[in-house]
């Protein structure tokens, strides 16, 4: 009866293959731009980068949802909703170690931005662990620069490089409808473009992941056009 049918081992096999591909691409001087049906693939990208160097890097995670559940907090068992917590070493620990290059992210190297739909226990866990969180409402009230700049400057004092994660559901569905899970109150493309430009000015973006774009919800192509422009803003 679950709406999220999934075989965990198959997912982690995919993450492992992606990690190996990321390492190969970076070794060949290519920039990894990963398009995936969900956010779990980020575990492959992040740990592919980890496998290349011991030098720490940050993760800036734009998503309507926290993706910070664990098997102990998730009300649905949805694996995709646990990937950021897993990357931080807080869930699926044995499976995570099967990914080449895996090592837990430091919490102080994570920024979650654009959220507006958190599960209650997930939100408590993020607060308990001290995840830097800038919600969509803060960006609406202060602007992208005003809301994000303090957190980005703090992260820049710790790392030089980042992985940029962009779940399409962070966008406002009434403007860019290309995701089934998006809820109202999302970011406008202009706000996200400003945010991505700020990232590019402060960090070396080592890789970028784009998750959960569903073209069947984007009949007029609005989301696709916005995503293309946002990729240009982030990586040129």
List each model region and its residues.
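Conserved alpha-helical scaffold segments that buttress catalytic/binding sites
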Residues: 1-236
């Amino acid at each position: 009866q679950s709406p999220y049918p999934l075989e965990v081992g198959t997912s982690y096999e995919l993450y492992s293959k992606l990690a190996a591909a990321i390492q190969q691409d970076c070794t060949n001087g290519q920039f990894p731009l990963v398009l995936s049906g969900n956010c779990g693939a980020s575990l492959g990208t992040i740990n592919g980068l980890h496998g290349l160097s011991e030098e720490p890097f940050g993760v800036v995670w734009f998503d309507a949802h926290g993706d910070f559940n664990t098997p102990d907090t998730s009300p649905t068992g949805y694996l995709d909703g646990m990937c950021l917590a897993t990357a931080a070493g807080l869930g699926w620990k044995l499976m995570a170690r099967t990914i080449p290059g895996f090592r837990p992210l430091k919490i102080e190297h994570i920024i979650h931005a654009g959220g507006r739909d958190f599960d209650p226990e997930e939100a408590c866990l993020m607060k308990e662990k001290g995840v830097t969180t800038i919600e969509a409402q803060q960006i609406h009230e202060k602007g992208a620069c005003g809301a994000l700049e303090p957190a980005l400057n703090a992260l820049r004092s710790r790392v030089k490089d980042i992985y940029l994660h962009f779940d399409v559901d962070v966008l406002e569905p009434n403007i860019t409808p290309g995701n089934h899970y998006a809820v109202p109150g999302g970011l406008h493309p202009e706000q996200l473009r400003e945010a991505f430009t700020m990232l590019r000015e402060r960090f070396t973006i080592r890789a970028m992941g784009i998750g959960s774009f569903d073209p069947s919800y984007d009949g007029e192509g609005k989301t696709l056009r916005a995503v293309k422009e946002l990729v240009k803003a982030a990586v040129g």
